[in-house]
Amino acid sequence: MRRAACPGSFDPITNGHLDIIVRASRLFDEVVVAVSINKNKVTLFTVDERMELIREALRDHPMAPSNVLVDASHGLIVDFCRSRGIQSIVKGLRAVSDFDYELQMAQMNNSLAGVETLFMSTNPQYAFLSSSLVKEVARYGGDVSGLVPDVVLKQLRERLAQ
């Protein structure tokens, strides 16, 4: 079985993330969205909230893939992959600047555990999109409705209103 991990913090998941996950689901028998837990990073949503938002966004997606799982990832992504028999990592690239960092990570992951990384170019309509940018725009009252799944938009508005 060809299995891949799509790692990230997904705080929150964006339509750009969703696009990469759905496209990866067509290339692999199973895709595991690995929601990273970084105790040094302050997140808007807890890991459980992020995982549930991803599950709901996938269920609501018009091309709802049935071969995507969502799980929490502690520590190195290669350890996550190794413990689950995952051979590949899928990463979306928005710009050339992403490639420099991601190439180093891919080479390190391959040297540590023989895990291959597949780079997918981001759909041009999402090339500028990041979770950080979504949160910043939303905090200042900007409209992010076309940038995140509806379920995320609702939770984002509620969280920022607190």
Curated annotation (Swiss-Prot):
GO terms for molecular function: ATP binding; pantetheine-phosphate adenylyltransferase activity. The record marks 17 as: Transition state stabilizer. It comes from the Bacteria. Its EC number is 2.7.7.3. InterPro entries: Cyt_trans-like, PPAT, Rossmann-like_a/b/a_fold. It is found in: Cytoplasm. GO terms for biological process: coenzyme A biosynthetic process. Substrate binds at residues 9, 41, 77, 91. Its main location: cytoplasm. ATP binds at residues 9-10, 17, 92-94, 102, 126-132. Its cofactor is Mg(2+). It is an enzyme of class 2 (transferase). Keywords: ATP-binding, Coenzyme A biosynthesis, Cytoplasm, Magnesium, Nucleotide-binding, Nucleotidyltransferase, Transferase. NCBIfam families: coaD_prev_kdtB, cyt_tran_rel. Belongs to the bacterial CoaD family. HAMAP family: PPAT_bact. Reversibly transfers an adenylyl group from ATP to 4'-phosphopantetheine, yielding dephospho-CoA (dPCoA) and pyrophosphate. This is Phosphopantetheine adenylyltransferase. The gene is coaD.
